[in-house]
Protein backbone atom coordinates (compact mmCIF):
# COMPACT_ATOMS: atom_id res chain seq x y z
CA UNK A 1 0.00 0.00 0.00
CA UNK A 2 1.25 3.46 -0.86
CA UNK A 3 0.24 6.86 0.51
CA UNK A 4 -0.39 9.65 -1.98
CA UNK A 5 -1.05 13.31 -1.23
CA UNK A 6 -3.95 14.68 -3.23
CA UNK A 7 -6.31 17.55 -3.93
CA UNK A 8 -9.84 17.07 -5.19
CA UNK A 9 -11.18 19.90 -7.33
CA UNK A 10 -14.46 20.63 -9.06
CA UNK A 11 -13.85 22.88 -12.10
CA UNK A 12 -17.42 23.64 -13.18
CA UNK A 13 -18.42 20.02 -12.51
CA UNK A 14 -15.98 17.30 -13.68
CA UNK A 15 -14.60 16.22 -10.24
CA UNK A 16 -10.84 15.89 -10.63
CA UNK A 17 -8.21 14.30 -8.38
CA UNK A 18 -4.70 15.73 -8.59
CA UNK A 19 -1.94 13.59 -7.06
CA UNK A 20 1.08 15.50 -5.74
CA UNK A 21 3.46 12.56 -5.19
CA UNK A 22 5.42 10.77 -7.95
CA UNK A 23 3.73 7.74 -9.53
CA UNK A 24 5.58 5.83 -12.28
CA UNK A 25 3.98 6.34 -15.68
CA UNK A 26 3.29 2.62 -16.01
CA UNK A 27 1.28 2.60 -12.77
CA UNK A 28 -0.86 5.68 -13.37
CA UNK A 29 -3.74 4.00 -15.18
CA UNK A 30 -4.18 1.38 -12.44
CA UNK A 31 -3.85 3.94 -9.64
CA UNK A 32 -6.35 6.21 -11.40
CA UNK A 33 -8.95 3.47 -11.75
CA UNK A 34 -8.71 2.77 -8.01
CA UNK A 35 -8.97 6.45 -7.04
CA UNK A 36 -11.96 7.08 -9.34
CA UNK A 37 -13.88 4.08 -8.03
CA UNK A 38 -17.05 4.19 -5.96
CA UNK A 39 -15.22 2.67 -2.99
CA UNK A 40 -12.48 5.28 -3.01
CA UNK A 41 -12.21 9.07 -3.56
CA UNK A 42 -14.49 9.04 -6.64
CA UNK A 43 -13.89 11.37 -9.57
CA UNK A 44 -14.26 11.60 -13.31
CA UNK A 45 -10.52 11.92 -13.96
CA UNK A 46 -7.10 11.89 -12.32
CA UNK A 47 -3.97 13.94 -12.98
CA UNK A 48 -0.47 13.80 -11.55
CA UNK A 49 0.94 17.22 -10.62
CA UNK A 50 4.64 17.94 -10.05
CA UNK A 51 4.92 21.28 -8.25
CA UNK A 52 8.71 21.04 -7.87
CA UNK A 53 9.63 21.57 -11.54
CA UNK A 54 9.39 24.73 -13.66
CA UNK A 55 7.13 25.02 -15.37
CA UNK A 56 4.89 22.90 -13.12
CA UNK A 57 4.08 19.60 -14.85
CA UNK A 58 0.66 17.92 -15.16
CA UNK A 59 0.33 14.39 -16.55
CA UNK A 60 -3.18 13.10 -17.08
CA UNK A 61 -4.02 9.48 -16.30
CA UNK A 62 -4.00 8.46 -19.96
CA UNK A 63 -1.49 10.93 -21.35
CA UNK A 64 -4.36 12.99 -22.75
CA UNK A 65 -4.85 16.75 -22.55
CA UNK A 66 -7.56 18.14 -20.27
CA UNK A 67 -8.39 21.82 -20.00
CA UNK A 68 -10.46 21.46 -16.84
CA UNK A 69 -7.59 19.62 -15.14
CA UNK A 70 -5.32 22.51 -16.13
CA UNK A 71 -7.74 24.91 -14.44
CA UNK A 72 -7.80 22.65 -11.37
CA UNK A 73 -3.99 22.64 -11.40
CA UNK A 74 -3.99 26.44 -11.50
CA UNK A 75 -6.17 26.50 -8.37
CA UNK A 76 -3.76 24.14 -6.58
CA UNK A 77 -0.75 26.15 -7.75
CA UNK A 78 -2.34 29.29 -6.31
CA UNK A 79 -3.11 27.61 -2.98
CA UNK A 80 0.38 26.10 -2.75
CA UNK A 81 2.05 29.36 -3.93
CA UNK A 82 3.92 27.41 -6.59
CA UNK A 83 4.61 28.31 -10.21
CA UNK A 84 2.50 31.48 -10.42
CA UNK A 85 3.52 35.14 -10.25
CA UNK A 86 1.48 38.27 -9.43
CA UNK A 87 0.13 40.07 -12.49
CA UNK A 88 -2.40 42.93 -12.62
CA UNK A 89 -4.20 41.88 -9.45
CA UNK A 90 -4.17 38.17 -10.25
CA UNK A 91 -1.71 35.33 -10.72
CA UNK A 92 -0.21 34.03 -13.95
CA UNK A 93 2.15 31.28 -14.98
CA UNK A 94 2.76 28.35 -17.30
CA UNK A 95 1.93 24.68 -17.05
CA UNK A 96 3.59 21.84 -18.93
CA UNK A 97 0.89 19.26 -19.61
CA UNK A 98 0.51 15.90 -21.32
CA UNK A 99 -1.01 16.03 -24.79
CA UNK A 100 0.35 19.53 -25.50
CA UNK A 101 3.61 20.16 -27.34
CA UNK A 102 4.39 23.40 -25.48
CA UNK A 103 3.53 24.79 -22.02
CA UNK A 104 0.11 26.43 -21.75
CA UNK A 105 -0.71 29.63 -19.92
CA UNK A 106 -2.73 29.51 -16.71
CA UNK A 107 -4.04 32.34 -14.59
CA UNK A 108 -6.15 32.95 -11.51
CA UNK A 109 -8.05 36.21 -11.35
CA UNK A 110 -11.42 37.57 -10.35
CA UNK A 111 -12.45 34.32 -8.66
CA UNK A 112 -11.89 32.32 -11.85
CA UNK A 113 -9.19 29.96 -13.08
CA UNK A 114 -8.16 30.21 -16.73
CA UNK A 115 -6.31 27.73 -18.92
CA UNK A 116 -4.95 28.32 -22.39
CA UNK A 117 -6.05 25.62 -24.82
CA UNK A 118 -3.68 24.38 -27.54
CA UNK A 119 -5.11 24.72 -31.02
CA UNK A 120 -4.42 22.54 -34.06
CA UNK A 121 -1.93 23.96 -36.53
CA UNK A 122 -3.81 22.66 -39.54
CA UNK A 123 -6.12 24.80 -41.72
CA UNK A 124 -9.64 25.03 -40.35
CA UNK A 125 -8.35 24.40 -36.83
CA UNK A 126 -9.09 20.67 -36.99
CA UNK A 127 -12.80 21.12 -37.75
CA UNK A 128 -14.38 18.61 -40.17
CA UNK A 129 -18.06 18.48 -41.12
CA UNK A 130 -19.24 14.86 -41.26
CA UNK A 131 -22.95 15.37 -41.89
CA UNK A 132 -25.98 17.41 -40.81
CA UNK A 133 -25.41 18.44 -37.20
CA UNK A 134 -22.36 16.18 -36.98
CA UNK A 135 -18.76 17.34 -36.84
CA UNK A 136 -15.30 16.28 -35.70
CA UNK A 137 -12.89 18.62 -33.92
CA UNK A 138 -9.35 17.28 -33.50
CA UNK A 139 -7.56 19.09 -30.68
CA UNK A 140 -4.05 18.31 -29.42
CA UNK A 141 -4.39 15.43 -26.95
CA UNK A 142 -8.11 14.83 -27.48
CA UNK A 143 -10.67 14.67 -30.29
CA UNK A 144 -14.37 15.49 -30.02
CA UNK A 145 -17.36 14.38 -32.06
CA UNK A 146 -20.01 17.13 -31.91
CA UNK A 147 -23.66 16.10 -32.33
CA UNK A 148 -26.63 18.46 -32.56
CA UNK A 149 -29.07 16.95 -30.05
CA UNK A 150 -32.09 17.95 -32.15
CA UNK A 151 -30.85 15.77 -35.00
CA UNK A 152 -28.99 13.17 -32.93
CA UNK A 153 -30.87 12.65 -29.63
CA UNK A 154 -28.87 11.79 -26.53
CA UNK A 155 -28.98 7.99 -26.12
CA UNK A 156 -29.90 5.98 -23.05
CA UNK A 157 -26.81 3.81 -23.49
CA UNK A 158 -24.39 6.69 -23.91
CA UNK A 159 -21.27 4.52 -23.45
CA UNK A 160 -22.36 2.09 -26.16
CA UNK A 161 -23.38 4.92 -28.47
CA UNK A 162 -20.04 6.67 -27.96
CA UNK A 163 -18.15 3.46 -28.73
CA UNK A 164 -20.22 2.99 -31.87
CA UNK A 165 -19.52 6.53 -33.04
CA UNK A 166 -15.77 6.17 -32.46
CA UNK A 167 -15.75 2.94 -34.46
CA UNK A 168 -18.02 4.11 -37.29
CA UNK A 169 -16.18 7.40 -37.75
CA UNK A 170 -12.75 5.80 -37.18
CA UNK A 171 -11.66 8.37 -34.60
CA UNK A 172 -8.32 7.45 -33.02
CA UNK A 173 -6.84 9.47 -30.13
CA UNK A 174 -5.68 9.03 -26.55
CA UNK A 175 -9.06 10.44 -25.51
CA UNK A 176 -12.26 10.92 -27.51
CA UNK A 177 -15.32 12.89 -26.47
CA UNK A 178 -18.83 12.69 -27.89
CA UNK A 179 -20.42 16.09 -27.29
CA UNK A 180 -24.19 16.22 -27.67
CA UNK A 181 -25.12 19.91 -27.78
CA UNK A 182 -27.84 22.46 -28.25
CA UNK A 183 -27.08 25.96 -29.46
CA UNK A 184 -30.44 27.67 -28.81
CA UNK A 185 -31.62 29.51 -26.81
CA UNK A 186 -28.16 29.14 -25.25
CA UNK A 187 -25.25 26.72 -25.63
CA UNK A 188 -25.27 23.57 -23.51
CA UNK A 189 -23.48 20.23 -23.78
CA UNK A 190 -23.73 16.63 -22.65
CA UNK A 191 -20.16 15.29 -22.85
CA UNK A 192 -19.26 11.60 -22.87
CA UNK A 193 -15.48 11.10 -22.73
CA UNK A 194 -13.52 7.90 -23.28
CA UNK A 195 -9.85 7.55 -22.25
CA UNK A 196 -7.91 4.81 -23.98
CA UNK A 197 -5.35 3.84 -21.31
CA UNK A 198 -7.88 3.44 -18.49
CA UNK A 199 -10.63 2.07 -20.76
CA UNK A 200 -12.97 4.44 -18.93
CA UNK A 201 -16.06 6.19 -20.28
CA UNK A 202 -17.71 8.96 -18.25
CA UNK A 203 -20.74 11.15 -18.77
CA UNK A 204 -18.83 14.16 -17.51
CA UNK A 205 -20.50 16.86 -15.46
CA UNK A 206 -18.22 19.39 -17.12
CA UNK A 207 -15.82 19.35 -20.09
CA UNK A 208 -13.54 22.25 -20.96
CA UNK A 209 -12.08 20.87 -24.18
CA UNK A 210 -15.57 19.81 -25.26
CA UNK A 211 -16.77 23.38 -24.70
CA UNK A 212 -13.90 24.66 -26.86
CA UNK A 213 -14.67 22.05 -29.51
CA UNK A 214 -18.28 23.24 -29.64
CA UNK A 215 -17.20 26.87 -30.05
CA UNK A 216 -14.88 25.90 -32.91
CA UNK A 217 -17.49 23.63 -34.51
CA UNK A 218 -20.24 26.25 -34.44
CA UNK A 219 -17.92 28.78 -36.09
CA UNK A 220 -16.29 26.20 -38.41
CA UNK A 221 -12.94 27.27 -36.97
CA UNK A 222 -13.30 30.86 -38.19
CA UNK A 223 -15.11 32.65 -35.35
CA UNK A 224 -12.24 34.66 -33.86
CA UNK A 225 -12.63 36.60 -31.61
CA UNK A 226 -15.48 35.01 -29.60
CA UNK A 227 -16.71 34.90 -26.02
CA UNK A 228 -19.09 32.02 -25.35
CA UNK A 229 -20.66 30.57 -22.21
CA UNK A 230 -21.40 26.85 -22.40
CA UNK A 231 -23.74 25.32 -19.81
CA UNK A 232 -22.43 22.05 -18.35
CA UNK A 233 -24.45 19.11 -16.98
CA UNK A 234 -23.43 20.30 -13.49
CA UNK A 235 -25.56 23.41 -14.06
CA UNK A 236 -22.47 25.63 -14.14
CA UNK A 237 -21.14 27.40 -17.23
CA UNK A 238 -17.63 27.23 -18.62
CA UNK A 239 -16.49 30.26 -20.58
CA UNK A 240 -14.64 29.96 -23.89
CA UNK A 241 -12.63 32.90 -25.21
CA UNK A 242 -11.14 32.88 -28.71
CA UNK A 243 -8.61 35.65 -29.30
CA UNK A 244 -6.96 36.93 -32.47
CA UNK A 245 -3.97 39.25 -32.76
CA UNK A 246 -2.77 39.48 -36.34
CA UNK A 247 -1.87 35.95 -37.43
CA UNK A 248 -1.82 34.68 -33.82
CA UNK A 249 -4.90 32.89 -32.50
CA UNK A 250 -5.37 31.80 -28.90
CA UNK A 251 -8.09 29.97 -27.01
CA UNK A 252 -8.87 30.00 -23.29
CA UNK A 253 -11.43 28.36 -21.04
CA UNK A 254 -12.38 29.89 -17.71
CA UNK A 255 -14.67 29.70 -14.71
CA UNK A 256 -14.66 29.04 -10.96
CA UNK A 257 -12.83 26.03 -9.51
CA UNK A 258 -13.79 24.66 -6.10
CA UNK A 259 -11.09 22.87 -4.11
CA UNK A 260 -13.26 20.52 -2.05
CA UNK A 261 -10.69 18.28 -0.34
CA UNK A 262 -7.03 17.64 0.24
CA UNK A 263 -5.26 14.94 2.20
CA UNK A 264 -3.71 11.50 1.80
CA UNK A 265 -5.08 8.58 -0.17
CA UNK A 266 -4.13 4.95 0.43
CA UNK A 267 -3.73 2.89 -2.72
Residue ranges and their predicted role:
Residues 115-158:
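Surface-exposed beta-loop interaction hotspot
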Residues 1-111, 143-267:
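A glycine-rich beta-to-alpha transition motif near the start of alpha/beta enzyme domains, typified by
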Amino acid sequence: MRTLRFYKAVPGGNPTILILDPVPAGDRAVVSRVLMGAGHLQAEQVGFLDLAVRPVRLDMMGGEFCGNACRAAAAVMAREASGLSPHEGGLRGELSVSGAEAPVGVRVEGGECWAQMPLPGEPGLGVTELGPGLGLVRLPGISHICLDEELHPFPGDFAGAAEGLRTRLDVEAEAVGCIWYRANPSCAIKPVVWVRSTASTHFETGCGSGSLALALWLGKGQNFPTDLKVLQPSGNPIGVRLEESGPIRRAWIHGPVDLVARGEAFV
